[in-house]
Amino acid sequence: MKTIKQIAFIGLALVVNIASAQRPDFLKKDSIQSALDGNTQVIYYNKTTASTPQPLIVELHSWSNSAESQQKIVAEQTHAKNWNFIFPNFRGVNNHPKACCSPFVIADIDEAIDWALKNMSVDTQNIYVVGNSGGGYATLAMYMKSRHNIRSFSAWSSISDLAAWYGESVERKNKYAAEIIQCIGKDSQYNALNAKLRSPLYWKTPVKKRENSLLQIYVGVHDGYTGSVPISHSIDFYNKLLSDGKEKDKSRYVSKQDADTLLKTQSFPTSKTPQTLGNRAILYQKTSKNIRLTVFEGTHEILNEVVLEKIQRLD
């Protein structure tokens, strides 16, 4: 288990990293009008300069950010590979009814992908969606509901159950409980049914549509302690997909005992030298077909330096 000093160091490193992040100069800005309600959605993008079609990275902003405000993004890493990149606003900060993985959010992101396919030289066999925190939440939502054929999804620090997260946020006395009510409340009161309607954990899994798509779920083991989203959200969603996909091998699931160990001790016992994710130890990993859960030494974060190196395959 990490000491208080070590956890504090991780938190400080995150603050320094976020503070030093800058929006790349090469990003351009455009806008799209929603077919649902005429809303104007801002998008940031960068096109490949290659002579042949290249992959498309669709990055989704976090809960408290918009495409205008979020600074830490994978645009630099995408630019280094000369791939296409798009960063849509999809209703901005999650504090109003049309945000928070509403039908408007799903449609906005799908329309941003439409824009990219029309205006960029995209290899349509290699479209990737990535997001952290609220962006991880939106990434899971797109796995479940996007009309596009997406090759791979990379979800980090994800919310999967808005109803559970409301209760967790109330207990922690943070700002998110009030924002959840702003998204799904009825008469300014929390509405459990509406919360579940916005939760990928309760949605029907498109097993057939996603049979050739990869889903990589990443979560730092300290999230929920030093971060705002308990790792149970990622674990429960992973297990749900296996159940919906009728995975028969019980060893592929995260057992209750394993989940309890991870949640209560923020570690997992092993006699082997752990594999790494970038420079972080992988504490626990489960895989079923094209779906993988990775619990790593970290907190509520995305490791930008490894996202694109891992997004194309399970290895």
Descriptions of predicted regions:
Residues 1-22:
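Bacterial Sec-dependent N-terminal signal peptides
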Residues 100-120:
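Alpha/beta-hydrolase active-site loop
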Residues 19-54, 132-134, 172, 183, ...:
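A domain-start/cap signature at the N-terminus of enzymes
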Residues 216-218, 224-225, 231-315:
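C-terminal catalytic histidine-bearing segment of alpha/beta-hydrolase fold enzymes
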